[in-house]
A protein has these predicted regions:
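Long, low-complexity, charge-dense
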Residues: 1-3, 9, 26, 319-330
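C-terminal non-catalytic accessory extensions
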Residues: 284-330
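Acyl-donor binding region in acyl/amide transferases
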Residues: 64, 68, 104-268
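Conserved N-terminal entry element of GNAT/NAT acetyltransferase domains
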Residues: 2-40
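Short amphipathic alpha-helix that is part of the acyltransferase structural core
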Residues: 26-71, 75, 81-101
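Short, flexible loop/turn elements at secondary-structure junctions
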Residues: 38-41, 87-89, 98-103, 140-142, ...
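Aromatic sugar-binding interfaces of carbohydrate-active proteins
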Residues: 257-264, 269-290
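A short helix-loop-beta-strand connector motif used in the catalytic cores of GNAT acetyltransferases and
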Residues: 74-84, 107, 269-270, 280-286, ...
Length: 330
């Protein structure tokens, strides 16, 4: 039985915790602010994040069923950091990610990393040696419900774009980061045939041949592979993508926005297969790895280069850029 979601956290409490030294940057669009916080320095902001995450995920057909979506990875000395977009006009959170740098990953007794994804995926020795030190894990990406409808909220148009401004800045602050590791999420409510088409298409064009990361219990498609192969007959990604988009629309659906965004972010994205997240509304999680320097040039210019142009001094450091940005307040 689902618990009742907590009431909104008082905006004055939130503002009192979103202090200048936690601000990462301004967004390229909509004049919003990006902050990095943790449970340790911003406990009330974390509660509001948990509230908004649970609302957004329940609406889509997932969620924890608890009063707020917070788990053990959000707390503790080695907790995930929370990257959020803040609307200073409405004093509210637009969306966010949580992340953990590879250098901070801790290993269990079997040599596997203790991550939010560890119950679904097994990490190879090659991944742990050659990728982990240069990787940041991203998870729990969300856009607040009020910002998911572009018809009712003009800032919704750039909500995802704003979040990626934050991710772009991370690659400047942490120059050792070469890869983003995360998950694309699809929900049980999504039409099965459409899901199978999307997953087949992704595997065809982005499949990881090295088994760097593998799902412990891989999701089995309900549509036969021969039937899907007969639909996606092109070698070219763009040509096959047009087929996918047409077929999904014929079913009365759209490709989920985040899935669409990720597959159009980098031509060399690696796909690690799909597993069911049984503790999170049985959502279907597809592991992906994106090389930062192989993202499309347009994306690099918008989300990474714009941050360097605004703050060239950030290139001299690996963390704590706020100490430079706000030095006049020290």
């Amino acid at each position: 039985m689902e618990e009742e979601i907590i009431q909104p956290i008082d905006k004055e409490l939130l503002k009192s915790e979103l202090t200048p030294e936690k601000q990462l940057r301004m967004t390229n669009k909509s004049h919003n602010e990006i902050y990095i916080v943790t449970a340790n320095d911003s406990p009330n902001v974390l509660k509001e994040i948990g509230r908004l995450r649970e609302i957004a995920f329940r609406e889509a057909g997932g969620g924890t069923g608890k009063s707020m979506d917070l788990d053990e990875f959000d707390f503790g000395d080695n907790c995930y950091k929370q990257l959020i977009v803040w609307n200073p006009e409405a004093d509210e959170i637009i969306g966010g990610y949580r992340y953990l740098l590879g250098k901070d990953w801790q290993l269990d007794e079997k040599g596997q990393p203790k991550l939010a994804t560890s119950h679904m995926f097994h990490f190879s020795d090659k991944f742990l040696k050659e990728y982990m030190p240069y990787t940041v894990e991203l998870g729990r990406s969300f856009v607040s419900l009020e910002y998911q409808n572009v018809r009712t909220n003009t800032k919704s148009i750039f909500a995802l774009d704003n979040l990626w401004d934050g991710l772009g800045a991370l690659t400047v602050l942490y120059p050792e980061v070469k890869y983003f590791f995360g998950k694309m999420t699809m929900y049980p409510s999504y039409i099965r045939r459409g899901r199978d088409m999307i997953l087949y298409f992704l595997k065809k064009h982005f499949d990881d041949k090295e088994n760097l990361v593998i799902p412990m219990k891989p999701l089995k498609l309900e549509t036969s592979e021969s039937e899907l192969a007969a639909i996606f007959t092109e070698d070219d990604f763009r040509a096959d993508y047009r087929i996918l988009n047409h077929e999904i629309r014929q079913l009365g659906f759209n490709i989920p926005p985040l899935v669409n965004a990720y597959m159009n972010l980098s031509p060399t994205m690696k796909l690690f297969g799909t597993a069911i997240n049984y503790g999170f509304g049985d959502v279907e999680e597809t592991g992906i790895l994106i090389a930062v320097d192989e993202t499309l040039e347009e994306k690099r210019i918008r989300h990474i280069n714009s941050f360097i142009e605004e703050h060239p001094e950030a290139l001299k450091i690996t963390s704590g850029a706020n100490k430079i940005f706000y030095k006049e307040k020290e």
